[in-house]
């Protein structure tokens, strides 16, 4: 049985300025996204479906900047609304206290979508092409975020059989019982595995929106599965149908991804050509 090392959340102290590990993992996440995005620019399946205007590194940097804003603002608001609405409605100024923790992936996803809608319109880029470009680059950032959760010893898993070789005691939980290291499970499922699947899937020409759909389904399934090993939020517990809030929020992602993939498969592309395998009707 393992014991979490209880790492100091402050990685570096520069006078009055404390640099936290979690902040560094966010920087790592954005750096990995930028690296992945620049690699994506070199892939023929992406270049071959470019819309008006050529993509450049400046586009990637601006897109990342807006994405960061979407992640932070959407992630914070999502946590406040999805997980502690009563508290934050009674204490609205606490919403601004981001340094106290509390972010939601599902809220961050909505924030990113809104920011990229604005980016697509101002740069005359096809929205779904943009989202398909982003999707394979997201999981590595998610993996970095889960690494930050593990370093902080937060979001630990449910009780595990002590005989499980990787069962771990998290001193921060205060229980002293061995638990699943669910942060690592999520790092592997939502991060590494999902990245590999999406990267390989996106290497071939796909209809617009299908890579985005694959991300929604893939993340939703990975998160839904990992939630069975993650300790539910203490103030929420297990909800209806014995599911956690994370699972309930993942269901719309899975269903939305399936519907989006079907829609992309059956609709004519933006150039007016029918989907593969169909001929235009006689007029």
Please place each PLM-identified region on the residue numbering.
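Hydrophobic, membrane-interfacing alpha helices
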Residues: 1-283
């Amino acid at each position: 049985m393992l014991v979490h090392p209880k790492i100091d959340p402050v990685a570096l102290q520069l006078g009055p300025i404390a640099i936290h590990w979690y902040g560094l993992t966010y920087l790592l996440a954005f750096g990995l996204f930028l690296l992945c995005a620049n690699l994506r620019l070199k892939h023929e399946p992406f270049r071959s479906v470019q819309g008006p205007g050529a993509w450049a590194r400046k586009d990637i940097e601006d897109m990342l900047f807006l994405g960061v804003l979407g992640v932070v603002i959407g992630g914070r608001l999502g946590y406040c609304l999805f997980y502690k609405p009563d508290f934050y409605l009674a204490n609205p100024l606490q919403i601004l206290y981001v340094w106290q923790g509390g972010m939601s992936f599902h809220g961050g996803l909505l924030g990113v979508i809104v920011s990229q809608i604005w980016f697509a319109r101002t740069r005359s880029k096809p929205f779904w092409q943009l989202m398909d470009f982003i999707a394979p680059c997201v999981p590595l950032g998610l993996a970095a975020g889960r690494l930050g959760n593990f370093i902080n010893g937060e979001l630990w898993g449910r009780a595990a059989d002590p005989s499980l070789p990787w069962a771990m005691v998290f001193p921060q939980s205060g229980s002293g019982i061995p638990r699943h290291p669910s942060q690592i499970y999520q790092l592997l499922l939502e991060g590494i595995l999902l990245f590999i699947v999406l990267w390989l899937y996106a290497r071939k020409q796909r209809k617009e929106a299908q890579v985005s759909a694959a991300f929604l389904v893939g993340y939703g399934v990975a998160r839904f599965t990992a939630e069975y090993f993650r300790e539910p939020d203490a103030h929420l517990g297990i909800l209806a149908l014995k599911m956690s809030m994370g699972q309930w929020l993942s269901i719309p992602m899975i269903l939305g991804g399936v519907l989006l993939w079907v829609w992309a498969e059956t609709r004519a592309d933006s150039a007016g050509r029918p989907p593969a395998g169909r001929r235009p009707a006689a007029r």
